[in-house]
């Protein structure tokens, strides 16, 4: 995120918060891996600023994505950080409910949260971070969740961390919240982190070259087959303008109907100028992030046009 954008959004949030004072508590929905041009720890800075506005006596609770880069600043300036439990993500609603119940419990005096994050230097590819099927990360998540509701454990989560960040203290591990029992929080968080470390080699993905992936896909009966170029994921901050997979499809599966997503404003503009049904020749890809490759020449027909807005 640009520094200017972050400052504007942050000031808007803090101004709204200041006008709302006095308040009983704060509940924030965050990601946890935000990076600003001049600031590595977006959420840590934001939580620190929120804490400065509301003071130490107002509870602050936030939800975090499983790929959050949980920093000491985040832990120190929040009373509770509640992690998502599923990947692929499908528990937004229930995670919000758990966070709201945590905040209400603090306000009602039902418990006094103590929170610890323990990390190990492991970066996990999204390919192996799933929680729906059997696998190393799913095992870690089940282990953490099995402790909730026992021995004063209010919440236990496992974080994959965003593997493409380049920041200090990056790592995966466990975050545990207990009812006033710091020793138990430390013990369980460190046990989750240790188990993560013990499974680190199980978390090494088996990846394929584009040509090999296409060959295996063509051997499958039925369809469709999804090829995922994870390093060019727009949701993870990449430009999403790589044409590596598209180029391989043209070379190895030219007769098979295929669909590729490429972010290329210049190419889109040319198609809009040419109009629906027109034949166009253009250079596609690697205009936003040219360090990873060169555009390829493509010729085709404009089948659809849209304004890019979705509902």
Say what each PLM segment does.
Residues 28-31, 67, 114-117, 159-160, ...:
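Core alpha/beta catalytic barrel or barrel-like domain that forms the active/cofactor pocket
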Residues 2-10, 17-111, 224, 229-243, ...:
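Active-site histidine-anchored catalytic micro-motif
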Residues 76-79, 110-119, 164-168, 187:
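Short, compositionally biased low-complexity segments
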Residues 1-16, 171, 175-178, 182:
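N-terminal glycine-rich anion-binding loop in soluble enzyme alpha/beta folds
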Residues 124-311:
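Hard-cation-handling environments
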Residues 96, 100, 104-145:
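Conserved anion/nucleotide-ligand pocket segment
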